[in-house]
Design a protein with these regions (language model features):
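The beta1-alpha1 cofactor-binding region of Rossmann-like NAD(H)/NADP(H)-dependent oxidoreductases
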Residues: 7-18, 51
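Conserved NAD(P)H cofactor-binding loop of Rossmann-fold oxidoreductase domains
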Residues: 36-42
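Substrate-binding pocket helix/loop in short-chain dehydrogenase/reductase
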Residues: 44-46, 53-55
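Active-site helix of classical SDR
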Residues: 69, 105
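Residue(s) in the substrate-gating loop at a strand-loop-helix junction
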Residues: 89
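Active-site-adjacent segment of SDR/Rossmann-fold oxidoreductases
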Residues: 94, 115-124
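C-terminal helical subdomain
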Residues: 122-124, 128-129, 134-136, 144-178
Length: 178
């Protein structure tokens, strides 16, 4: 089977690079590189968010995406194939009080994805993808009536075909699963 799952700290470039070498040694170059790891800050005005919490959020949400792309992309470019899907958020296109660090990290993902799309060979794709509003622990931490939104399991059934149907004309776009 052409799947592999492993828990790792994506903020650790060395760990991500070792994992990528392991994957590339076992399988062909990936058709899809999906970057979905993220954390959210505890609700607070920006000036009250502890430096360590802000830094760790950026390390995971932004640098983790970069680490994964940097570790896989050279091989993908060598074969001029692959779609890179970087999970963003509605808050990567708008803002909300109490979650400025999270919003800023998702705005970074939007910019990173668009810039990357301009650097890739014509046969490759990079998009920022907002999953829409889903009932998750992350949303629940914001006290936003998360239980009134779609459950992750039903969302995944719609998301998989959506992602598999991302086309070359979508390159550089900010997409949303609605």
């Amino acid at each position: 089977e052409n799947t592999d799952f492993k828990a790792l700290d994506i903020s650790d470039h060395g760990m991500v690079r070792s994992w990528a070498k392991e994957i590339l040694g076992k399988f062909d170059v990936p058709d899809y590189l999906i970057n979905n790891a993220a954390v959210i800050n505890k609700n607070a005005p920006l000036w009250k968010v502890p430096f360590k919490e802000f830094s760790e959020l950026i390390d995971i949400n932004v640098k983790g995406t970069y680490n994964t792309i940097k570790s896989f992309l050279p091989e993908m470019i060598k074969y001029k194939k692959g779609t890179i899907v970087n999970f963003s958020s509605g808050w990567g296109r708008t803002t909300s009080p109490q979650v400025a660090p999270y919003c800023s990290s998702k705005w970074a993902i939007e910019g990173l994805s668009k810039s990357l799309s301009q650097e890739l060979p014509d046969s490759m794709i990079s998009v920022a993808l907002s999953p829409g509003v889903i009932d998750t622990d992350m949303l629940r931490s914001c006290n936003l009536n998360a239980d009134s939104y779609e459950k992750p399991e039903s969302w995944a059934k719609r998301a998989a075909p959506y992602i598999l149907n991302i086309k070359q004309t979508d390159n550089g776009e900010s997409l949303t699963i609605s």
